[in-house]
Curated annotation (Swiss-Prot):
Full protein name: Chitin-binding protein 4
GO biological process: defense response to fungus
Organism: Moringa oleifera
Protein purpose: Chitin-binding protein. Has antifungal activity against C.krusei, C.albicans, C.tropicalis and C.parapsilosis. Has antinociceptive and anti-inflammatory activity in mice.
Molecular-function annotations in GO: chitin binding
Highest taxon of the lineage: Eukaryota
Coiled coil: none
Post-translational modification: N-glycosylated.
Alphabetical UniProt keywords: Chitin-binding, Glycoprotein
Disulphide linkage map: none
Length: 40
């Protein structure tokens, strides 16, 4: 899960958009939500 969250952070740094297709990434998206991240 931590690795998936790191991938989400990399995606956030590049596209500033966290693509949450997996439940683990959805949790990461909620955490990154404080950084104004739109969760698709």
């Amino acid at each position: 899960q931590q690795q998936q969250c790191r991938q989400g952070q990399q995606t956030h740094q590049r596209q500033r958009v966290c693509q949450a297709r997996r439940p683990a990434i959805q949790r990461c998206c909620q955490q990154l939500r404080n950084i104004q991240v739109q969760c698709r």
